[in-house]
C-alpha cells in the first residue's frame, strides 16, 4: 500500500521549459514512489522502429504469428535495454508482478510477453524499454521547481492509441489548455 502522499498510480506531466529534453512533453505513469525514490514509465514516446512481432521472434518464443500486437515505448533513460510491461490488473505473474493499484500493474518478466503474443495476458498493456528513475527527494524537488504537474491516471490516456495527444489529454484532466502554458514559472 502506498503512503497518502505517494504518486504511485498517478501521471506526471512534463511542463514546458523543464530543462531536460528527454522528458519534453512526456507523460509518465508512476509505478513506485517512496522515501527511497521513484520509478515511472513514459507512456507517450513510442519506439516506431521496434515491432512487437519482431521482438517475440528475437526472443525465440514459439507462438507463430503473434495473436496480439502491443506498442513498444521509450520508458525512460535508465536501463533502456530492459523491458517493462505496464498493464491492467487483470493479469498477474506470481512473484514478478508489481501491483501498483487496483487498476494498474507492472511485470518485467518474459512470461507476460509470451502470454500477450499468444492472445492471453492482460486486457490492456504497453511495453516500455527503460524506465524513469529518481533518487530520494529528487522528484519532489523537480515538482517544487515546476518541472512536473500530477494528475490521476486514466486508462484511456495510459493505454490509448494516440501517443501524440496523451500530453494534452492529461493536461485537460486538470482543466488546463496546453496552449495557455508558459515555459517559465514563478511564485507570487
Task: Give the positions of each predicted feature.
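A short aromatic-anchored loop/beta-hairpin motif
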Residues: 1-128, 132-188
